[in-house]
Amino acid sequence: MNMPPTKEPYDGYCGTSYAAKLLGISVGTVQGLVEKNDLKAWKTQGGHRRISLQSIDAYQRRHNLAPASLMQGEDRLRVLVVEDDDETRLMLQANFDQWGLPLDAVMYASAMEALLDMPSLQPQVLLTDLRMPNVDGFEFLKTLSSHALFSNLAVVVITGMSAEDVQAKGGLPEGVQLLQKPIDMDWLHGFLDALMSMRQINRRSRAQIA
């Protein structure tokens, strides 16, 4: 399984989940816009829908919508969640909203869809399950760990598997955190908060050097 080459933000295409986040609408509504040709899209050989980012920008302009950019603002954390369980995704999003942290989260049920969108999204945090249909979390992380994006990515595996079972499957790449289900939301809150604090410290240090 190969990962798409890294692209500049908003250059090229994205999947339906990312398009929905950019437009502030549901995935179903995005699919409806594609069917009405309001958004330009095509499908990969694997059947995954790709949507032109240029057509999303054009749609926003036609309808006088403010561009909803996940790439704007260094103070916001970009979080990508890969989890095939609907209830877990909803629970994570509800907690993110409740915490009020400056983050933008994009949810995926498919590891393949997430891989296709990562060059456009350029997340700083990845939360991923391991047991998923088609491409599982082990294969997902193996593919991702060979890509340049991985070096600057904070990764947390969220799984119902025990540490022993994970190790028996080959283990995780170095630096990946293991968080077992049921999810300790206090730990996750603290982890994300700490990442944001470190980013602020690093930005101040760069500003002082400049």
Where are these regions (language model features)?
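C-terminal output helix
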Residues: 55, 183-195
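Receiver (REC) domain active-site loop signature in two-component systems and cognate sites
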Residues: 132
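Alpha4 helix (beta4-alpha4-beta5 surface) of REC/receiver domains from two-component response regulators
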Residues: 139, 162-179, 190
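A short, Lys/Arg-enriched interface patch at domain edges and termini
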Residues: 56-80
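Helix N-cap/capping motif at the beta->alpha junctions
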Residues: 107-116, 137
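Hydrophobic/aromatic residues positioned on beta-strands within the core alpha/beta folds
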Residues: 156-158
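Two-component/phosphorelay signaling modules centered on CheY-like receiver
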Residues: 86-106
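Short helix-start
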Residues: 9, 13-18, 36-65
